[in-house]
Regions:
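Alpha-helical membrane segments and adjacent membrane-interface helices in multi-pass membrane proteins
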Residues: 62-137
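Hydrophobic alpha-helical transmembrane segments
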Residues: 45-50, 78-82, 93-98, 125-130, ...
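Alpha-helical membrane-inserting segments
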Residues: 54, 58, 62, 83, ...
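Juxtamembrane/interfacial segments around transmembrane helices
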Residues: 96-107, 125-135, 142, 178-181, ...
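Short helix-perturbing small/polar motifs within transmembrane alpha-helices
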Residues: 23-37, 43, 49, 57, ...
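N-terminal amphipathic/basic-hydrophobic helices that include classical n-h-c signal peptides
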Residues: 1-21
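Hydrophobic transmembrane alpha-helices
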Residues: 16-93
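Membrane-embedded alpha-helical hairpins and interfacial helices in multi-pass inner-membrane proteins
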Residues: 69, 146-219
Length: 219
């Protein structure tokens, strides 16, 4: 039995054709949003993992200063500054926490002059290593809050280095029981090198941000 008006109600309704799916527009939008979030989360994880491996690679570019000091000359500190400046405070912190976990688990990510693993974390250079997450966080935090110029990047790097050496020298003091000896072993040999690292980190980070801004403006 046909009810009057049924034909009018059905007018304009087209059944799905071959190859089409009857998925509503809101559902498609939800799926698209979910997919986009998954891709973004994957990208963020990849950045954090890649940053931890970058620091591990730089840790192997090391010059031993034994028997003068157990603390080696390495570009690892420069890598940590760059991770904080370029990835930002939160991702930089996460990357350095992952780096410490990798090292504590026995992966060869620490500088090769030490024994590796937990032993190296608890050794004379452990204070520097344990400070890395805070160093990366602080560098990123200061750099994020400003014009992201060379001067701000240099300031962020300097403050981060102060935290790094405060942690490192405090840990060395536990071993030496002497502030003078801790400073001799952990600071005196590295002042000039750290100034160069600060300048390099600031130059790279500020230049990178300018390139990012130009790229976004061109889109």
């Amino acid at each position: 039995m046909r009810v009057e008006g049924d034909d009018q109600a059905l007018t304009g309704i087209r059944p799905p054709q071959i190859g089409e799916t009857a998925v509503s527009k809101p559902t498609t939008q939800v799926l698209s949003t979910s997919y986009g979030r998954t891709i973004e989360a994957t990208r963020q994880v990849a950045l954090v993992v890649g940053a931890s491996l970058f620091v591990a690679l730089c840790a192997h570019i090391t010059i031993s200063l034994m028997p003068l000091t157990p603390v080696p000359l390495t570009v690892q500190n420069l890598a940590v500054l760059l991770v904080g400046l370029l990835l930002g405070s939160r991702r930089g912190f996460a990357a350095m926490m992952l780096y410490l976990i990798e090292g504590a688990a026995g992966f060869p990510v620490f500088n090769p002059t030490g024994p590796g693993g937990i032993v190296q974390l608890l050794g004379p250079t452990g204070g520097f290593l344990i400070a890395y997450p805070i160093v990366a966080f602080l560098a990123g935090y200061v750099f994020e809050r400003g014009t992201r110029s060379f001067l701000r990047a240099a300031t962020a790097s300097l403050l981060a280095e102060i935290v790094l050496f405060t942690g490192g020298l405090t840990w060395l003091y536990v071993f030496t029981h002497s502030l003078a000896k801790a400073a001799y072993l952990g600071l005196n040999f590295f002042i000039a090198a750290e100034v160069i690292k600060i300048m390099l980190a600031a130059g790279i980070a500020s230049r990178w941000r300018k390139l990012e801004e130009r790229f976004r403006a061109a889109e």
